[in-house]
């Protein structure tokens, strides 16, 4: 990723972090105010899209979680494709450290959560909740430190978060998929074949891809696979480079779409998702509520699991010679970044909605516990990580 692109990206992400915090705070205020009933009612209001026999009716909350979040995953897929084809994940040497760190940051938190909920099969469904990292929040916190943090650490965290997102995509596909509809899957496969055909034929206009992508989203939604995965599939078929008869400076389809989506995802979709899902009523919750297995597993997974997994696996990779230390970074810097990866927020909340998205009466109670655990664990990780990096970088580093 070019340096200027990283700088522009981080400027967006510091603003994104502030807006996401604001959205979460507003959600908490709404859920604990006289407007709490209205807050719940608004997001349960059914909305119908379509015409005649082609109608889709869902509560507003599900349009946000299944529809708008598919656009977020489209952006994630574009970032993954760009980095794998020509960025920070394009060679084994470049990808080694963030890949190993991301694996540790997913495995250890999941094991901690599972160890605390092992006796409850329903609670165990949330094992992947603390395995996620919110890239906008994490990079926003890192950017607050300015030149104290070397650019190599910011690149490392960006690559780690992208691999973490890829892991979340695979988790959703394999572990949070309901019963499947063969016909809908067949139609989705036909859409994928059309998208691949467009790519191979050299089509560089975006509208045919996006039009088929909408149909693909409907097919995936009806198939039983989570609809957000349609965004990832669409992203992988968007052409990366310009054609041979275009100049090197010509706009590339993937870049055009990525740059067009980033502000919408940053300033609209993720804040709306946070506002819709972060509201947790604290009324009647005793101080011991955080000690229940689900919230405790999430808090410990995000705060302890992430730092142990990311830092521990990074230490092994560097000491073994598998990967180099990020340029200009020190061990305590890497530890601070490992702490910041415990900010799961939107991604953890999203996986939580999938884990307990059932008609079981227990799901509502677990939903509250998930939000409580995610907000607490993310806050703890973000604050402590920021303080560690600030103290370890009192003198600004040269970038």
Curated annotation (Swiss-Prot):
Localization recorded for this chain is: Cell inner membrane
Catalytic activity as recorded in UniProt: Na(+)(in) + 2 H(+)(out) = Na(+)(out) + 2 H(+)(in)
| One Pfam family named in its UniProt record | Na_H_antiport_1
Output the InterPro entries linked to this UniProt entry: Na/H_antiporter_dom_sf (IPR023171), NhaA (IPR004670)
Gene3D superfamilies annotated for this entry? Na+/H+ antiporter like domain
Q: What is the topology of this protein in the membrane according to its UniProt annotation?
A: Multi-pass membrane protein
GO cellular component term of the entry, any: plasma membrane
Which UniProt keywords are listed? Antiport, Cell inner membrane, Cell membrane, Ion transport, Membrane, Sodium, Sodium transport, Transmembrane, Transmembrane helix, Transport
GO terms for MF: sodium:proton antiporter activity
Gene Ontology BP term (one): regulation of pH
Would the keyword Cell inner membrane be found if you checked this record's keyword annotation?
A: yes
For whether the record's keyword set contains Membrane, the answer is yes
Quick one: where is this thing mainly located? Answer: membrane
* Transmembrane annotation, as ranges: 12-32, 60-80, 94-114, 126-146, 155-175, 178-198, 206-226, 263-283, 284-304, 336-356, 372-392
Similarity comment text for this entry: Belongs to the NhaA Na(+)/H(+) (TC 2.A.33) antiporter family.
Give the protein's function: Na(+)/H(+) antiporter that extrudes sodium in exchange for external protons.
Question: Could you tell me what this protein is called?
Answer: Na(+)/H(+) antiporter NhaA
Source organism of the structure:
Rhodospirillum rubrum (strain ATCC 11170 / ATH 1.1.1 / DSM 467 / LMG 4362 / NCIMB 8255 / S1)
